[in-house]
UniProtKB/Swiss-Prot annotation:
Its main location: endoplasmic reticulum. The chain crosses the membrane at residues 10-30, 41-61, 91-111, 129-149, 156-176, 184-204, 353-373, 389-409, 440-460, 461-477, 489-509, 517-537. GO terms for biological process: dolichol-linked oligosaccharide biosynthetic process; glycolipid translocation; protein N-linked glycosylation. This is Man(5)GlcNAc(2)-PP-dolichol translocation protein RFT1. It comes from Drosophila melanogaster.
Length: 556
């Protein structure tokens, strides 16, 4: 196998960022339309309650299995066959089906009730979301294969397609009947799930036929020179084990090990299951608190969700794709069960350098967001939701404090992701107990601080929680690299020049807040360019490295 894991990870991160930007622009546009024309309460039901149901089912069903399978494929390829991996991925479907029963009962009977005029639509939407999750997971084996064999463009293409299908169907129904917005959401969810399944299996149906013809042609004594797109798709795929589409189904593929499941893989999966439940609570904790207790009305929940989504743009556009790609890179580069001193030192040094650069990049973005967010929260929210939306000052206060959470979220995503990628099963089990403490503390803090500070209390609780997790993961990284005299955590400090420029930019932008909007925005653009220039001057080597990889990606 000659696939370049680092290059594929960078390519995946780059395409994912572009995809996230395009799709989130579309999503934000739809949300703005709903806020202005349908109502905040409907937006709260869809974006908080129903998407929380989808997030809960999908995360608990596949996160642990997917992470464990990625690690097993990279580090236990001789002990864990592809047939066992495919069987393992198909476990997500019955797991999700089983989870649907208690989740639907809770969502329909235990959580705070919706208004009577939306009750029937809400019930239908809950069942539709649950079924769409089961349907989507039927393509999980194909999604996993595409990830392992670096089909980066396929992932981006299908993700874009399913977002477009979901958005188009939703808007088509809502523009015809605004009162059917929740039903439209449910139908759109089902349609997007069907798109994912058909897209994944449709691609591999044609890919397997083309790959077979390519191999046959190249085996001839005088093979015809392959076309560029054939080389891109089929070259360096000698280890691709699938011969027919039915190999993606459970129990069909030939299994040299004899057993349907791998015991070590199941042990690792169970470790991630415990961790996954806790991580889901930490990720969506504020939504669970809002749903379980009547802290906020659906309208207030929608306000918080809109501001939270705007504040999380950097996380969705940039941090999450980088986190996913870096996790994949570290699992494929470093072994969990062997100390770094006993692993190939070239790989270890490369991993240390990559971790350092990742921390440098995301922490710099987080500091920029925090600096400019203090001065530009109000104009952003005014342009997004209109004067009525920003009235009262709550949305502005939420977004300003959320900018602090962005920095902590950026650092935590990379440091904790690295820790998860290199932990042993025993280390993961130990950390699960700490995650339990974090989870309980976060929920308690959310409830207490919300009672004191209102919705801003959710952000305070989240910041305290992330800071605690950062301290633990950075301690792990420092302890792991100390014997090698390497310190990738140096990337957390972007440098004096950049720091001083940011500080001055923040003061200048804050000073011009009372000016007219055009002047304020113009000052912000100039200050932002100054910050970017100072960062580039302070980190010339990293800029040159990014430029080289960017050119390679463009050429390919």
């Amino acid at each position: 196998m000659a696939r370049n894991v680092l290059e594929s990870s960078l390519l995946g991160a780059g395409f994912s960022i572009i995809f996230q930007i395009l799709c989130r622009i579309l999503t934000f546009g739809i949300n703005a339309y709903i806020v202005r024309h349908v109502g905040r309460e409907v937006l709260g039901i869809m974006n908080v309650r129903l998407l929380l149901l989808e997030s809960t089912l999908l995360f608990l069903s596949r996160e642990a299995i997917n992470r464990a399978a990625l690690s097993a494929n990279a580090q236990q390829g001789d002990r864990c066959s592809w047939a066992q991996l495919i069987n393992q991925m198909w476990l997500t479907v019955p797991i999700c089906a089983v989870l649907c029963a208690p989740c639907l009962y809770i969502w329909l009977n235990w959580l705070s009730a919706v208004d009577a005029i939306y009750a029937s639509q809400y019930e239908f939407a809950c069942y539709a979301v649950a079924f769409s999750c089961v349907l989507e997971l039927m393509a999980e084996s194909a999604v996993f294969v595409a990830q392992v064999f670096c089909f980066v463009k396929l992932k981006i293409l299908l993700n874009t397609l399913h977002i477009l299908v979901r958005s188009a169907i939703f808007l088509w129904i809502v523009t015809g009947d605004r009162s059917a917005a929740i039903n439209a959401f449910a139908i759109a969810q089902l349609s997007s799930a069907v798109t994912i399944v058909l897209g994944q299996y449709g691609f591999f149906y044609f890919y397997l036929k083309g790959f077979k013809d390519f191999v046959t042609q190249q085996a001839k004594k005088k093979p015809v020179a392959p076309k560029a797109w054939q080389v891109s798709l089929y070259e360096h795929m000698d280890d691709f084990p699938f011969k027919q589409l039915s190999d993606f189904l459970p129990g069909v593929m030939f299994n040299p090990n004899g057993k349907h499941f791998n015991r070590e893989l199941q042990t690792l999966t169970l470790s991630f299951v415990k961790q996954g439940v806790l991580k889901q609570i930490l990720t969506e904790g504020e939504k669970y608190v809002m749903s379980v207790s009547p802290v906020l009305s659906f309208g207030e929940q929608a306000t918080y969700d809109v501001v939270n989504n705007l504040g999380s743009m950097a996380a969705r556009f940039i941090f999450r794709p980088i986190e996913d790609s870096s996790y994949f890179y570290f699992t494929q580069t470093l072994s969990r069960d062997i100390k770094l001193a006993k692993q190939p030192q070239e790989r270890v040094r490369q991993a240390s350098s990559v971790l350092n650069n990742l921390l440098l990049g995301v922490s710099s973005i987080g500091l920029i967001a925090f600096t400019f967010g203090q001065s530009y929260s109000y104009p952003v929210l005014l342009l997004y939701g209109g004067p009525d939306f920003v009235a009262g000052g709550l949305p502005q206060s939420l977004l300003q404090w959320h900018c602090l959470a962005i920095y902590l979220l950026a650092v935590n995503g990379i440091s904790e992701g690295y820790m998860f990628a290199t932990n042993t099963s025993r280390d993961i089990d130990k950390y699960n107990y700490l995650m339990a403490i974090f989870s309980v503390s976060f929920l308690v803090l959310s409830y207490i601080l919300t009672g004191i500070f209102g919705p801003v209390g959710f952000i305070f609780a989240n910041c305290i929680n992330m800071l605690s997790r950062i301290l633990y993961s950075t301690y792990y990284i420092r302890h792991q690299y100390r014997p090698l005299s390497l310190d990738p955590l140096l990337g957390l400090w972007p440098g004096k020049l950049f720091g001083c420029t940011l500080f001055l930019a923040g003061i200048v932008c804050y000073w011009y807040q009372s000016s007219d909007l055009a002047t304020h925005l113009g000052v912000g653009v100039l200050a932002g360019l100054a910050c970017l220039l100072s960062w580039a001057l302070a980190h010339r080597d990293l800029v040159r490295l990014a430029w080289r990889y960017g050119r390679r990606i463009k050429i390919e």
